[in-house]
């Protein structure tokens, strides 16, 4: 399925970029070739990562969490992070720029998965205090990561991280009442963050009704619907 999606993506890149590539570079397949090279690098990296046993990922969860926090702190340091459109999300490494929030999300979710596996019994016990304390620890970690992401700011990564983590917590078999309270609190917090920011409010309303400003805030969504 992943390879099929990759092939479909390359096909769409070729279809959408040929006129622009021909006009700008004289090579109609310029962007396709470049994207294909990136895809090949990604496949080679995926093949290498697949060889690492799951037990190593589990043992390395705490280290990866510290790496995630470190990256999100470093990118905010003056002279280290690169500001793009008002957000400090990138670190330059030679000829490439790395969006540290993507690595941080991956590392954090590996840690959460490791934690849920190690403390699954505590999360599922009937004793409220024991299960609540077991659930509180990863939630504190997620809160710290969310604050660092919001300082960039990168609200979209916060939403993806929290939604994925909540899904993992639910699948781990946590008490339904505790999960409902956690879900309600998280949703309320997200709503406050959206409504308190004009930019986030505009993005939400543009998503709900992109045709209202088809050549402004809703341009990308409208073009994707047309395509």
Predicted regions: what they are:
Residues 12, 78, 171, 209-212:
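Signal for well-folded cores of large energy- and translation-related assemblies
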């Amino acid at each position: 399925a992943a390879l099929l999606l990759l092939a479909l993506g390359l096909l769409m890149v070729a279809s959408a970029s040929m006129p622009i590539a021909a006009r700008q570079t004289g090579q109609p397949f310029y962007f396709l070739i470049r994207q294909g090279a990136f895809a090949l690098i990604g496949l080679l990296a995926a093949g290498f990562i697949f060889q690492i046993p799951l037990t190593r990922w589990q043992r390395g969860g705490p280290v990866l969490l510290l790496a995630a926090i470190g990256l999100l702190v470093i990118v905010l340091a003056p002279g280290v992070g690169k500001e793009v459109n008002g957000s400090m999300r990138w670190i330059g490494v030679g000829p490439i720029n790395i969006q540290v929030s993507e690595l941080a999300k991956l590392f954090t979710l590996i840690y959460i998965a490791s934690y849920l596996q190690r403390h699954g019994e505590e999360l599922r016990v009937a004793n409220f205090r024991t299960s609540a304390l077991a659930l509180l620890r990863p939630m504190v970690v997620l809160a710290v990561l969310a604050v660092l992401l919001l300082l960039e700011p990168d609200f979209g990564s916060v939403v993806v991280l929290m939604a994925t983590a909540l899904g993992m917590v639910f699948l781990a078999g946590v008490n339904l009442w505790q999960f409902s309270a956690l879900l309600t609190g998280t949703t309320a917090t997200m709503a406050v963050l959206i409504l308190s920011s004009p930019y986030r409010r505009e993005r939400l309303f543009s998503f709900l009704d992109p045709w209202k400003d088809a050549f402004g805030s809703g341009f990308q969504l409208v073009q994707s619907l047309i395509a």
